[in-house]
Amino acid sequence: MMPNRLEPELDIYQYPEHLRACLAPLPKGPGVYVFHGQSESLPLYIGKSVNVRSRVMAHFRAQGEAKMLRQTRHISFIETAGELGALLLEAQLIKQQQPLFNKRLRRSKQLCALRLQADTVTIAYAKEIDFAVTPHLYGLFANRHAALEKLRAIADEHRLCYGKLGIDKLPAGRACFRYSLRKCAGACCGVEPTQEHARRLGAALEQLRIACWPYAGRVALEEQGEALRQYHVIHNWFYLGSVSSLAQAQRLQSAASHFDSDGYKILCKPLIAGDYRIIELP
């Protein structure tokens, strides 16, 4: 069957005839959209946009997506109040439904961070402590190797001692090898005071600090769009869901089951910056 055009002004977009009815109602506002194949329980692709219609149309001019489009039977969408709600819902749905053509978003069993206590750095794992409420954690890493690679990079940039950081073993009574190369400031041999090394380490890590959850419990984050207002319910950086009223938000009592690194990355900056109205929930 020959492809058809949806609208004259959008003649660059081509689409299979059977998708005409799905494309017509797509909104020009923010939301999440889903490409469905034959299976109703396993979507092909889940995406989000501040303009759902425009983004979905763009899929039809991407040559690399021809395989997915051939399998698409219909397209659904969920409108949101704004971009933040779309980001949160997309991440939640991808993890829940694992669409075939999305990059997998799974809870990492090895999710870890650098933990600074006094002048000692260790690797802390999210499966062992709650990152949402534990202070002095820095960076979010998929595994121990990634965390140590970042620590090495920080040490190299700031002339910190591998031995003091636990990356290498220190030779008894001698300076580390990197000190002879002028890549270490000498905390290993007394040239740099231990307190100064600890201060510089803390300063170097600061940009990676994981913010502790700043509220006593659940909150509702209000997002107002042109035609829709939503309350996104969050607890310990974990997205519990979105509702249309505070009464519904108070009834949304699901507990955060684990530290959600995706939720943290989406929410931390706008929440701490005060970009949205926050209502603490009982």
Which residues fall in each region the model found?
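Conserved catalytic/ligand-binding micro-motifs in nucleotide and anionic cofactor chemistry
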Residues: 2-44, 48-282
